[in-house]
Amino acid sequence: KRLLQDLNIKINQVIPEGGSVQDLQNLPKAWFNLVPYREVGLMTAIYLEKNFGMPYISTTPMGIVDIAECIRQIQKHVNNLALNQTFNYESYIDQQTRFV
């Protein structure tokens, strides 16, 4: 959650955390899905991509290399969907990985 909050990205749903059946109707409103652990949620993300055209990111944001890769994938999806705006998260990546 912190990663997305740091990037000023609003979280639509965290499944299954505190979710209900009624919340599931909001799933297609998301721009993309982040699957931080492939063991949990990957099949759902694949289903949502196939049926609703929602891209997903399955890179686990752990370790310097994978955190940077995950953020770059987020940036790619956000820039593909954002209208009249371009996002660049390289300074955030630098800030998070420089002194590790």
UniProtKB/Swiss-Prot annotation:
Alphabetical keyword list: 4Fe-4S, ATP-binding, Chlorophyll biosynthesis, Chloroplast, Iron, Iron-sulfur, Metal-binding, Nucleotide-binding, Oxidoreductase, Photosynthesis, Plastid
Example of a GO cellular component annotation carried by this entry: chloroplast
Record text on cofactor binding: Binds 1 [4Fe-4S] cluster per heterodimer. The cluster is bound at the heterodimer interface by residues from both subunits.
Pathway listed: Porphyrin-containing compound metabolism; chlorophyll biosynthesis (light-independent)
Subcellular location: Plastid, Chloroplast
GO biological process: light-independent chlorophyll biosynthetic process; photosynthesis
Keyword Chaperone: no
EC number: 1.3.7.7
Main EC class the enzyme belongs to: oxidoreductase
Xref: SUPFAM superfamilies: Helical backbone' metal receptor
Enzymatic reactions: chlorophyllide a + oxidized 2[4Fe-4S]-[ferredoxin] + 2 ADP + 2 phosphate = protochlorophyllide a + reduced 2[4Fe-4S]-[ferredoxin] + 2 ATP + 2 H2O
Molecular-function GO terms, alphabetical: 4 iron, 4 sulfur cluster binding; ATP binding; metal ion binding; oxidoreductase activity
Essential cofactor(s): [4Fe-4S] cluster
Lineage top rank: taxon: Eukaryota
Function of the protein: Component of the dark-operative protochlorophyllide reductase (DPOR) that uses Mg-ATP and reduced ferredoxin to reduce ring D of protochlorophyllide (Pchlide) to form chlorophyllide a (Chlide). This reaction is light-independent. The NB-protein (ChlN-ChlB) is the catalytic component of the complex.
Subunit structure as annotated in this protein's UniProt entry: Protochlorophyllide reductase is composed of three subunits; ChlL, ChlN and ChlB. Forms a heterotetramer of two ChlB and two ChlN subunits.
Family: Belongs to the ChlB/BchB/BchZ family.
Protein name as annotated: Light-independent protochlorophyllide reductase subunit B
